[in-house]
């Protein structure tokens, strides 16, 4: 098996290096990842400047682009040879609920799925036990691989920041959701100009049983299938009925 690994925290981030080291015990691995932190890049592609992959001594690559750029480039003729699976992560911090909209970690996996490959995104709910998350992925890949081949979705995995032995198990979950985002942070720079920072993520508002927030909070690995189709199917009929009524008045 040949696995393409990417992330949004950048090539030098601890998470991707720990993940690649563990994955190399079970497969051939090649990293194509951003050359710097591109967190919250979502599925953006770079269209107004060239991408410049830099070939590293160990055979991996870092790219002056987004996570989606990296996977798009790798799978559309840049890499020679077949790739069987895309794994994105390990993200420093969870990607649950509304986080998935902004996540470059998920975007890299979604780009792989869009280009026809099974894909996994993995995040750690903290910054300490990356080895736990890497081991979870390596344990799940042999079990999930054939199932992934039949899915049009990616698998989003969130791992509690605990030693592996303290994990309580695995739960298949739906996404929860957070409260409205915190206000932006207003400051003055050394030139006395006003600058703004995006504020921190809001606290979970729906962390009820069955959500990814609930699972991770209670020591379980959450596994959520994620799709690119954002259609709200449950609203199609009511919206059509409303439209029909408005145009027949």
From Swiss-Prot:
Nuclease keyword on record: no
Gene Ontology CC annotations of this record: cytoplasm
The protein, known as: 5'-nucleotidase SurE
InterPro entries assigned to the protein according to its UniProt record, in alphabetical order: SurE (IPR030048), SurE-like_Pase/nucleotidase (IPR002828), SurE-like_sf (IPR036523)
Residues the record lists as binding a divalent metal cation: 8-9, 39, 91
EC id: 3.1.3.5
Lineage: Bacteria, Pseudomonadati, Pseudomonadota, Gammaproteobacteria, Pasteurellales
EC top class, as a word: hydrolase
Primary location: cytoplasm
Necessary cofactors: a divalent metal cation
Function statement: Nucleotidase that shows phosphatase activity on nucleoside 5'-monophosphates.
Gene3D superfamilies in UniProt: Survival protein SurE-like phosphatase/nucleotidase
Family note: Belongs to the SurE nucleotidase family.
Cofactor binding note from Swiss-Prot or TrEMBL: Binds 1 divalent metal cation per subunit.
Pfam families per record: SurE (PF01975)
Disulfide partners: none
Keyword terms, alphabetized: Cytoplasm, Hydrolase, Metal-binding, Nucleotide-binding
Catalysed reaction equations from the record: a ribonucleoside 5'-phosphate + H2O = a ribonucleoside + phosphate
Any GO MF annotation of the entry: metal ion binding
Location(s) in or outside the cell: Cytoplasm
């Amino acid at each position: 098996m040949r696995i393409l690994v990417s992330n949004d925290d950048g090539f030098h981030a601890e998470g991707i290096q720990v993940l690649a080291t563990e994955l190399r015990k079970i497969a051939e691995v090649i990293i194509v990842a951003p050359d710097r932190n591109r967190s919250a890049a979502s599925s953006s592609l770079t269209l107004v400047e060239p991408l410049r992959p830099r070939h590293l001594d160990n055979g991996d690559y870092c790219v002056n682009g987004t996570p989606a750029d990296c996977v798009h480039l790798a799978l559309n003729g840049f890499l020679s040879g077949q790739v069987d699976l895309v794994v994105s992560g390990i993200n420093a911090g969870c990607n649950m609920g509304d986080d998935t909209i902004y996540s470059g970690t998920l975007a890299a996996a979604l780009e792989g799925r869009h280009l026809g490959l099974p894909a996994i995104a993995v995040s750690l709910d903290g910054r300490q036990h990356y080895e736990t998350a890497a081991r979870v992925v390596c344990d799940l890949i042999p079990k999930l691989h054939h199932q992934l081949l039949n899915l049009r979705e990616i698998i989003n995995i969130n791992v509690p920041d605990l030693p592996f032995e303290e994990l309580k198990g695995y739960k298949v979950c739906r996404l929860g959701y957070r409260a409205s985002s915190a206000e932006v942070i207003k400051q003055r720079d050394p030139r006395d100009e006003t600058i703004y920072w995006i504020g921190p993520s809001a606290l979970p508002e729906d962390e009820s049983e069955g959500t990814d927030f609930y699972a991770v909070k209670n020591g379980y690995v959450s596994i959520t299938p994620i799709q690119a189709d954002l259609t709200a199917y449950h609203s199609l009929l009511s919206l059509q009925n409303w439209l029909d009524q408005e145009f027949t008045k």
